């Protein structure tokens, strides 16, 4: 089902943002991660650029640049979390990545500060798994002790364009960092993983998006991993099938999924649960090399908007808002951001979620200040 998205400005007052440029020299910008790096209560931004050999972070509020580590090649993804409770996050990094599995070393390393996060950090290699591509921290057993989930892009013997091979999904526990298998039955290509407490039981589940669609992985009470297919994604023939990126959002009390489809695709698809199954609605089919999708309550009204960005021309970032009947689109950035990744956080402490995006072809990092109303309080 294809629904033509309508310009939000024609139907409702658009959300208002003020654009701020932080950096313009991040060659191959690929990921931006908001977190408090220096334990001062302000949300900083870690910027990963695949065309650079330095991993850097920008300190809020002046956005002074600091180098975390040097001489890193083929950086592709990171996840940050304070695993030792000192107030400063540890970083798990995937590097030495290549799209060609046979040439992808797939190094996974842990980076830890030396007492001053503004100085160079220590690096410890923990694994080598070809095409290691997406890393996320997750509390899989509800203990509060998170593990690192690693989703390689493809299997070790996969070749373009079909990438026919089994793709492992693994995790590591801090300490011994031993690789443990979650699943190795998925085929093709897996582009994204998203961590969510799917059934509200205090334990995180894993959503993956790839050629076989959107899958859910859950650790059972018997400590066995269970895999459930949520949706097959785009119904086109392989390798144009499935999903590329997925996010979980809320329309009041109703949960929905937002996805870019197919891999690096042109569609923004929304999935809402009917009586028996998830129903797919394509709300936009105009993206060119879609690469990031995020959901967040930008209006502070209990309903999540969708933020989607694409790397190809004309290089735009869109926001989609639901008015009760249809999704309305507004442009956040028109031509100035080839968005490889966007993230949301309250960057200026005013109670509103702001947006940060990093551009691949545009080599830049921006944050978009939310000028809307603060969170409503109960009378």
Q: Where in this protein do the model-derived segments appear?
A:
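Bacterial N-terminal signal peptides
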Residues: 1-9
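Beta-propeller-forming repeat regions
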Residues: 12-379
